[in-house]
UniProtKB/Swiss-Prot annotation:
Function: Catalyzes the reversible conversion of 2-phosphoglycerate (2-PG) into phosphoenolpyruvate (PEP). It is essential for the degradation of carbohydrates via glycolysis.
Catalyses which reaction(s): (2R)-2-phosphoglycerate = phosphoenolpyruvate + H2O
Name of the coding gene: eno
EC code(s) of this entry: 4.2.1.11
Provenance organism: Treponema denticola (strain ATCC 35405 / DSM 14222 / CIP 103919 / JCM 8153 / KCTC 15104)
Protein name in the entry: Enolase
Cofactor or coenzyme needed: Mg(2+)
Location of the protein in the cell: Cytoplasm; Secreted; Cell surface
Stated family: Belongs to the enolase family.
An example molecular function term from Gene Ontology annotations: magnesium ion binding
Length: 433
């Protein structure tokens, strides 16, 4: 039997030293699952709500004992005896129990911890790896890493305004080789930065955080790709996460304020798009995430019309893994890709629904970590299960990021000759005929 007989939540720490929720689930056949919930630094306005204690005497108000209590009382009682093999029903029970649009009653962190742990317990009950349980027999595509090697924005204390400068090893034959290529570029970049007198300390997601200009970050990445022995645009391409909602100033001088590098500089949406056009013409940039503010539907539709057949335009804060917002984006032609973060929506089933909706509409989907991570590698299995072809899970440092890469290599080894690496083909459906 796969009935739930035991659920326990606890407070643990994430990679930034902030509290987060861990949940354990045991089934009547002694199967077991455990999951840890990630947390973001720059969060979208429309994300599901994390429940925090607000008690300034503990962890500066960031404790999660209230969320843990919800797991151990209300949720545990509701799910007692429920069939763990019916993930959709389990998640529906959680959604109904919460009863709010943004998961504010139970907390998305409490709900997600339970949802993920139940999925792991169910996979254990069937004797299946998590990716096979969630994805079925056809889950064999390995994702291309989107590795953050230079940090800016709210992820660092330097003067780079945009949050993430990433590389993607699209020319690799396998995930293992792609990870090797990424690591080699990462170490080449470190050598270059060190020789030019820059600090090589790393940010929240393991990338370097040198105190350089926005465009200089691209120049350094190009040099690092070449120093590692690869060809920019063929072997390795560049992706950006601008996190532009963090730059948007809705005050008297409405626009995008480059508050770290040039506080007096404010661009409107058209000028932001012109900046990206210039960069795309000079650098092998294939993907830009959150290039505009999360409420600028008109701007996103216009940018997608102009650039959507050249690059991947990814909605993160714009879509927040929410099918309602995604459906509107599809209808209005805004973006051509969605970033997928489990804790933005709060359950495994809703996450899967968002990916399937995107794929059906011809959008790509990128499975993503958060800046506050743990050793949990659930998203590695999820990326393979849903055959998204892309995963964004940090740089080649910090064990909380490396845990995901190591899990991907294990999965590829397990799949053997059946494993397929997405490579540049992951962008094929974006090219309009």
């Amino acid at each position: 039997m796969s009935d739930i007989i035991y659920i326990e939540g606890r407070e643990i720490l994430d990679s930034r030293g902030n509290p987060t929720v861990e949940v354990e689930v045991q089934l009547s056949d002694f199967s077991y699952g455990r999951a840890c919930v990630p947390s973001g630094a720059s969060t979208g306005e429309y994300e599901a709500l994390e429940m925090r204690d607000g008690d300034k005497s503990r962890y500066m108000g960031k404790g999660v004992l209230k969320a843990v209590d919800q797991v151990n009382t209300v949720i545990a009682e509701e799910l007692d005896g429920a069939d763990a093999l019916d993930q959709a029903e389990i998640d529906n029970m959680l959604i109904n129990l919460d009863g709010t649009e943004n998961k504010s009653k139970l907390g998305a962190n409490a709900m997600l911890g339970v949802s993920m742990a139940v999925a792991r317990a169910a996979a254990d009950s069937l004797g299946l790896p998590l990716y096979r349980y969630l994805g079925g027999v056809h889950a064999m595509q390995m994702p291309v890493p989107m590795a953050n090697i230079i940090n800016g924005g709210r992820h660092s204390d330097n003067k780079i305004d945009f949050q993430e400068y990433m590389i993607m090893p699209v020319g690799a034959p396998s995930i293992r080789e792609g990870i090797r290529m990424t690591a080699e570029v990462f170490h080449a970049l470190k050598d270059i930065l060190k020789k030019e007198g820059h600090v090589t300390a790393v940010g929240d997601e393991g990338g370097f955080a040198p105190n350089i200009e926005n465009v200089q970050a691209l120049d350094y990445i190009m040099k690092a790709i070449e120093k590692a022995g690869y060809k920019p645009g063929k072997d390795v391409v560049i992706a950006l996460d601008c996190a532009s909602s963090e730059l948007f100033d809705a005050g008297d001088r409405k626009g995008y304020k480059f508050w770290k590098s040039e506080p007096s500089k404010i661009l409107n949406a058209d000028e932001m798009v012109d900046l990206f056009k210039d960069w795309i013409s000079k650098y092998p940039i294939v993907s830009i995430e959150d290039p505009l503010d999360q409420n600028d539907w008109e701007g996103y539709a216009k940018m997608t019309k102009e650039l959507g057949n050249q690059i991947q335009i990814v909605g993160d804060d714009f879509f927040v893994t929410n099918t309602k917002r995604l459906a509107r984006g599809i209808e209005e032609g805004a973006c051509n890709s969605i970033l997928i973060k489990l804790n933005q929506i709060g359950t495994v089933t809703e996450t899967i629904d968002a990916v399937r909706m995107a794929q059906k509409a011809g959008y790509t989907a990128v499975i993503s970590h958060r800046s506050g991570e743990t050793e949990d590698a659930f998203i590695a299995d999820l990326a393979v299960a849903l055959e998204t072809g892309q995963i964004k899970t940090g740089s080649m440092s910090r064990s909380d990021r490396i845990a995901k890469y190591n899990q991907l290599m294990r999965i590829e080894d397990e799949l053997g000759y059946n494993a397929r690496y997405a490579g540049m083909a992951t962008f094929a459906n974006l090219i309009k005929k």
